[in-house]
């Protein structure tokens, strides 16, 4: 029995070796014929090889075809048959996953301007480029250049950019996240945006870390969009969302913009980040929320933000549940009390919100100034709120 099994294994090995030799001979025959054939016959050779039983072994032939087209790049625009050769070669390299052909396919990608050939080449690179940093980097740079082109008002070829986006999604490398994120938010149109979004979410790795990279390193509009994506994501914990929001608030507080649009984006990002921190009661961010309040008060005085923004900011500080938050809100109440004592007009809603947050914080640091409201010309509603806040203070 044992001897029979050994004989069977030996026979199978011999058959496999013979088949491999046969496949190699067939490949060599195809390659010799391709080298001497006319363009029409070259196309027929590739078609026969792709449809034959040994198609899986024909990688070097299809690479030879791609190299032939690249070597004759100056003639490609004069004869459509070159494009046909390139498309068959690139597509088959991708189908069989012939990794040795990836650099030839990239050379073709750079050499041709034909959209269909570019799309076929991109599709192949999405397979044979797996694990190859150079191929991934090349595709990243190309998509980034098309994003820049689109942002300037020019429209890249939709089929080509779609194929490149899909290729990056298949490759799934974290280095592609920034360019795919840009593509999602560029306004390519619903169909291309959906392709970009699918590719983005196919990227492997730490989603929070990739969003952090966008918030730290990409242009202002993308920083804001990355923050929004983080807050809305169901892939991140509340702690991760809060950490990203804290970073975004730090950046938006300490960055500058030369134009009105940039300043508006920074302001929007501040309020978005503060809201995200308040919703998660992220007390670690108290210093940034205090700085945010100081900036918001100045903007409110200049008419740059409305009352709701100021109220939201005070509520965000109240959500921090820290002594420092109570100290800053008490300082604000001192200022309002001073204005009121001098007969200046006050906003009931602003005063009420300060007092309500001091009550929620329950810090006795506010005692004296909450008491002082009872001696000023505030409305009965404000005084009642102050008494309620006093009752909540912890001793």
How does the language model describe each region?
Residues 113:
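Surface-exposed, active-site-proximal loop segments in enzymatic domains
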Residues 375-377, 381:
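Predominantly the C-terminal beta-signal and adjacent terminal strand-loop region
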Residues 1-4:
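Positively charged n-region of N-terminal signal peptides that target proteins for export
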Residues 14-17, 305:
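Hydrophobic alpha-helical segments of integral membrane proteins
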Residues 21-33, 54-75, 98-110, 130-151, ...:
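Amphipathic alpha-helical scaffolding segments comprising HEAT/armadillo-like alpha-solenoid repeats
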Residues 6-15:
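Bacterial N-terminal signal peptides
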Residues 32-35, 40-56, 75-98, 107-108, ...:
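Structural detector for internal amphipathic alpha-helices that build alpha-solenoid repeat scaffolds
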């Amino acid at each position: 029995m044992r001897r029979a099994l050994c004989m069977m294994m030996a026979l199978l090995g011999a058959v496999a070796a013979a088949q491999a030799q046969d496949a190699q001979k067939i490949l060599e025959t195809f390659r010799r014929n391709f080298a001497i054939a006319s363009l029409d016959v070259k196309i027929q050779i590739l078609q026969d090889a792709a449809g034959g039983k040994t198609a899986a072994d024909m990688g070097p032939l299809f690479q030879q075809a791609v190299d032939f087209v690249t070597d004759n790049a100056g003639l490609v625009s004069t004869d459509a048959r070159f494009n046909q050769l390139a498309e068959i070669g690139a597509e088959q390299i991708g189908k069989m996953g012939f990794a040795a052909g990836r650099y030839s396919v990239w050379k073709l990608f750079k050499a041709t301007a034909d959209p269909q050939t570019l799309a076929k080449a991109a599709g192949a690179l999405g397979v044979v480029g797996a694990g190859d940093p150079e191929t991934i980097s090349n595709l990243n740079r190309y998509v980034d250049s098309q994003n820049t082109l689109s942002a300037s008002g020019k429209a890249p070829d939709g089929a080509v950019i779609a194929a490149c986006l899909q290729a990056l999604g298949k490759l799934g490398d974290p280095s592609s996240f920034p360019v795919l994120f840009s593509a999602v938010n560029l306004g390519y149109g619903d169909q291309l945006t959906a392709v970009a979004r699918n590719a983005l979410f196919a990227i492997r790795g730490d989603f929070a870390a990739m969003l952090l990279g966008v918030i730290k390193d990409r242009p202002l509009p993308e920083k804001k969009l990355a923050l929004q994506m983080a807050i809305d994501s169901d892939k991140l914990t509340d702690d991760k969302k809060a950490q990203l929001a804290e970073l975004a608030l730090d950046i938006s507080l300490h960055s500058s913009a030369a134009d009105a649009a940039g300043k508006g984006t920074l302001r929007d990002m501040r309020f978005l980040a503060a809201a995200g921190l308040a919703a998660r009661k992220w007390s670690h961010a108290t210093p940034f929320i205090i700085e945010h309040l100081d900036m918001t008060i100045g903007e409110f005085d200049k008419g740059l933000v409305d009352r709701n923004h100021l109220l939201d900011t005070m509520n965000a500080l109240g959500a921090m549940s820290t002594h420092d938050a109570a100290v800053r809100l008490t300082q604000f109440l001192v200022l309002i009390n001073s204005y009121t004592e001098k007969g200046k007009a006050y906003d009931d809603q602003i005063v009420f919100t300060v007092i309500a947050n001091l009550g929620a914080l329950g810090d006795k640091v506010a005692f004296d100034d909450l008491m002082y409201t009872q001696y000023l010309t505030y409305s009965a509603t404000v005084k009642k709120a102050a008494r309620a806040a006093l009752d909540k203070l912890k001793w």
